[in-house]
């Protein structure tokens, strides 16, 4: 009992974040929503208030941070996409060069001499 009194007097609360805390995340994902309700959506993306004359409120720090993160992610996606395209083009160019090299080797291969050269009959 003394331990309980000590715990209550310190005011420390320990919250359990187990499966019960994430209970609705699968349903939200199936509905096309964020797993965490504060992840994205109108409650986090739209301003909390606006002026009486209809002007929008200035963006808040969290909105600016999320916008910067999305822009950074989009830039990275574009950069990686460009790198993939450049790599694919380089690979295709190397494949074409290999084919041309094989053709050149076949054309420059040693030709038969002697009787076979004078009598161009069907090859064996």
Swiss-Prot record:
GO cellular component, one term: mitochondrial inner membrane
Key words of the record: Mitochondrion, Ribonucleoprotein, Ribosomal protein, Transit peptide
Region (Disordered): 99-124
Primary localisation category: mitochondrion
Record localization: Mitochondrion
Family, similarity comment: Belongs to the mitochondrion-specific ribosomal protein mL52 family.
Pfam families, A to Z: MRPL52
Keyword DNA repair: no
Transit peptide location: 1-23
Protein name: Large ribosomal subunit protein mL52
């Amino acid at each position: 009992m003394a331990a309980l009194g000590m715990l209550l007097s310190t005011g420390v609360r320990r919250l359990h974040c187990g499966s019960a805390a994430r209970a609705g995340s699968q349903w939200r994902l199936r509905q096309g929503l964020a797993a965490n309700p504060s992840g994205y959506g109108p409650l986090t993306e739209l301003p909390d208030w606006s002026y009486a004359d209809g002007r929008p409120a200035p963006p808040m720090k969290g909105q600016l941070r999320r916008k910067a993160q999305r822009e950074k992610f989009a830039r990275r996606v574009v950069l990686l996409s460009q790198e993939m395209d450049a790599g694919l083009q380089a690979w295709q160019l190397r494949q074409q060069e290999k084919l041309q090299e094989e053709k050149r080797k076949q054309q420059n291969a040693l030709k038969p001499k002697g009787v076979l050269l004078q009598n161009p009959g069907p090859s064996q």
